[in-house]
Amino acid sequence: MNPLIQELTQEQLRTDIPAFRPGDTVRVHAKVVEGTRERIQLFEGVVIKRRGAGISETYTVRKVSNGVGVERTFPLHTPRVAQIEVVRYGKVRRAKLYYLRALHGKAARIKEIRR
């Protein structure tokens, strides 16, 4: 890769991101712009996948809201996310948890790791 591009991407990488993996429950504080106002919107759910590397890395968070599954994909190093909190660590044996889409209720629970 071009050294100039490498240097620019290194400057934009965030260092305040906690370590989390698929299966973990996270609370994402996303900045939302509505007209001239900017506010923080919380999105809490299970990380079902992480993909990419470096500046282009993304993660997808899934939650069930009013009986409807909602998935939202965030870039990892975006300034549009104010903060990421890890609520609990889950124990899973897969990197992509797409099977959670078909499960409901207690079957969709993930075993918790105590840390």
UniProtKB/Swiss-Prot annotation:
The record's section on InterPro entries has: Ribosomal_bL19, Ribosomal_bL19_CS, Ribosomal_bL19_sf, Translation_prot_SH3-like_sf
What GO cellular-component annotations does this UniProt entry give? cytosolic large ribosomal subunit
GO BP terms: translation
Q: Which UniProt keywords apply?
A: Ribonucleoprotein, Ribosomal protein
Gene3D superfamilies associated with the record: 2.30.30.790
Q: A single Gene Ontology molecular function, please? A: structural constituent of ribosome
Q: Does the keyword Aminoacyl-tRNA synthetase apply?
A: no
* Cited function: This protein is located at the 30S-50S ribosomal subunit interface and may play a role in the structure and function of the aminoacyl-tRNA binding site.
UniProt family annotation: Belongs to the bacterial ribosomal protein bL19 family.
Annotated protein name in UniProt: Large ribosomal subunit protein bL19
Q: What is the lineage of its organism?
A: Bacteria, Bacillati, Bacillota, Bacilli, Lactobacillales
